[in-house]
Amino acid sequence: MAVKVGINGFGRIGKCVVRAAINNPDVEVVAINATGDNEGTALLLKYDSVHGTIPNEVTFDDDNIYVDGKKIRVFHDRDASKLPWSEEGVEIVMECTGKYRDAEEAKVHLNQPTVKKVLISAPGKNEDLTMVMGVNQDMYDPAKHHIISNASCTTNCLAPFAKVLCDEFGIKRGMMTTIHSYTNDQKILDARHKDPRRARAAAMSIIPTTTGAAKAVAKVLPQLKGKLDGFALRVPTPDVSATDLVCELEKPATKEEINEAFRKAAAGE
């Protein structure tokens, strides 16, 4: 039986989660919380300039949107404590607003009787566990881990190959650079921003800025705590990012040995 999911926040991540869930028989999105009107929410789900148009029929009424006739209830409340997830039987809340990243705030979803878990789609604070699939999912204990961070996109990129190097050769220290597509946090044209570098036009600039991914990776690979640092280059592309890691290994390794280690990891050996 499919798990019933509610999504708080219908930005880039929230929308992608719904799109992915449409064709997943194990997941049923039954409710979302979006700040805009239902017509706009339906249009944003149907059409995407980066990922294309979904083939499904998307319609709406005053209280819901429908995907191929299947109802998804839509709430409109900026206060997460007022969201009636249990009315739709929500079991897992995907926290995708970027606002409730601290578990002390995200736990408000657990006040609803049917909600069992909260998954934060960003780096968390005070969370029960930060989990990157393929790296540390074995650490998950359903009896005690109820508020879980999925980390950042860059951490999800960095952690898998850092794990291979760490397991096979050991890492003494390293420096990471992420070449990162622009995001909605940046400006289309020059405008004020708390980070003056991000105030420059996103589609016209290569913008050096900070990233917490190198340090956050220690949440999923504790043996790397204090060993990695890094920064980001925001580049004028709408999608796809790359991560470059330069590191000193604890034991010698040839190019062939490193490539073979990655080949085996990719094959699940």
Predicted feature residues:
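N-terminal Rossmann-like NAD(P) cofactor-binding subdomain of oxidoreductases
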Residues: 1-199
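C-terminal substrate-binding/catalytic lobe of Rossmann-fold NAD(P)-dependent dehydrogenases
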Residues: 168, 174-177, 185-269
